[in-house]
Amino acid sequence: METVQLRNNPRRHLKKLSEESLNKQPEEVFDVLEKLGEGSYGSVYKASHKETSQIVAIKQIPVESDLQEIIKEIAIMQQCDSLHVVKYYGSYFKNTDLWIVMEFCGGGSISDIIRLRKQTLKEDETATILQSTLKGLEYLHFMRKIHRDIKAGNILLNSEGTAKLADFGVAGQLTDTMAKRNTVIGTPFWMAPEVIQEIGYNCVADIWSLGITAIEMAEGKPPYAEIHPMRAIFMIPSNPPPTFRKPELWSKDFVDFINLCLVKNPELRSSATELLQHPFIKTAKGESILRHLINEAQDAKLKRTELKQREVEPEEEENADEDEADVGTMVQAGSKDLNTMKEFSTMNEAADCTMVEKDKLNTQMGTMLINDEDEEETGTMKQCTEPVQPAKPSFLEYFEQKENQFGTPEKTTPAPSTDPSEWKIPLNGDYSFLKDWSVTELQLRLNSLDPMMEQEIEEIHHKYQAKRQPILEAIESKKRRQQNF
């Protein structure tokens, strides 16, 4: 109803907060209606602008958060005026919080829609979303801005089905004197190879991320999602470009579009303007085909809320978050027979860390910033330099107690060391000794492999940095010397 009223009376449509409104307390200007979730750096709320009744989104950020990054986000949003970029209306300081007032997108993020419907997107739906997203990227890149965190969680739909780019917490400005940036920033699984390798990158890094996002929309998760993010960071630059798990399910145009986005050499990668002319995008249907997605997601969210209110008993409340994290089975919608169930896969809700609705989920898919010389401490996802020893599962302790209680049978081979650091690769490559180990011992060793790998990766990273830093310092020293002359 509000949308119709605003359309019939365009003078009452909020474009920007007036100076008078900005000088008032935010509660005098807005009615906060409900919490929507968690965004980068703070909580996001749905609110109503009292003067126009327009619904807006308000991001509330604690002042102790990284103000430099927040100011950068505001500055980038202020400079943007595009139908396909979330609009900025103004900001307030309230007690210890900064309130950023932005355009409200009632459809939610694409990842929210996939999660709530428990179903991936069809090919024509993906094409329509990609078309709007490319228009937003074309605008940003024309303004010499890189988003640097393109993924389904950062593409929002309004109630009409228009896709808009959101969450500029890690976006960067490209200047003439800094044609390529050298900071590793973004979300690991969506990162372009040149971003990971720190060899300098420009706007087409967003195009790689868009290609990964297209796979995410079609299959429910990005490539490498099943493996540890730190391992993915090593695999993305060294492996061939990813593609669909089953390319035969998709049209040739869609597969070709993905291939053009995921070109490892950034100089050969297509731009947003070029991709808008691709047959897969040019034949995309209108935004109206996305409205049923929005309605189905909102219905699912409402049912989920009602079910939660009915079923959660007081003694179960502490386990409610764990129950919500199980989103069941997701149906993958193929392209050749849209009415046939093509494939089932389990979707992990942790894949979307941009906005977690109400329930706080632990995730390993967060936005990552590594080795930024100017913004060294600003990353959302920090690297842990100390190796974490795995907690021993309770079932292992149970079996060990039983073995101690009744005595362990004699073994033909020595008992394996419980210290992972002592586990060596056999020189002859013969692992036949493993057949004499108990299930408990094998499970313990298996559970310790990932922490061992992370520790080794961290050590390699430190060695690389130790070699790299003197070279950077020498280059900087020579530049200063040249300037003095």
From Swiss-Prot:
Positions of ATP binding: L36, G37, E38, G39, S40, Y41, G42, S43, V44, K59
InterPro entries registered for this protein in UniProt: Kinase-like_dom_sf, Mst1_2_SARAH_domain, p53_tetramer_sf, Prot_kinase_dom, Protein_kinase_ATP_BS, SARAH_dom, STE20/SPS1-PAK
Pfam families xrefs: Mst1_SARAH, Pkinase
Modification(s) after translation: Autophosphorylated on Thr-183. Proteolytically cleaved by caspase-3 during apoptosis at Asp-326 resulting in a 37 kDa form. Proteolytic cleavage results in kinase activation and nuclear translocation of the truncated form (MST1/N).
Record keyword Phosphoprotein present: yes
Entry keyword set: ATP-binding, Coiled coil, Cytoplasm, Kinase, Nucleotide-binding, Nucleus, Phosphoprotein, Serine/threonine-protein kinase, Transferase
Enzyme Commission code: 2.7.11.1
Major subcellular site: cytoplasm
Regulation: The C-terminal non-catalytic region inhibits the kinase activity, the enzyme is activated by caspase-cleavage. Homodimerization and autophosphorylation of Thr-183 is also required for full activation.
Reactions that this protein is recorded to catalyse: L-seryl-[protein] + ATP = O-phospho-L-seryl-[protein] + ADP + H(+); L-threonyl-[protein] + ATP = O-phospho-L-threonyl-[protein] + ADP + H(+)
Location of the Protein kinase domain: 30-281
Keyword Kinase among record annotations: yes
Compartment(s): Cytoplasm; Nucleus
Cofactor(s) recorded in Swiss-Prot or TrEMBL: Mg(2+)
GO MF, one annotated term: protein serine/threonine kinase activity
Family indicated by similarity: Belongs to the protein kinase superfamily. STE Ser/Thr protein kinase family. STE20 subfamily.
Function comment: Stress-activated, pro-apoptotic kinase which, following caspase-cleavage, enters the nucleus and induces chromatin condensation followed by internucleosomal DNA fragmentation. Key component of the Hippo signaling pathway which plays a pivotal role in organ size control and tumor suppression by restricting proliferation and promoting apoptosis.
Assembly and interaction partners: Homodimer; mediated via the coiled-coil region.
Official protein name in the record: Serine/threonine-protein kinase 4
Organism of this sequence: Xenopus tropicalis (Western clawed frog)
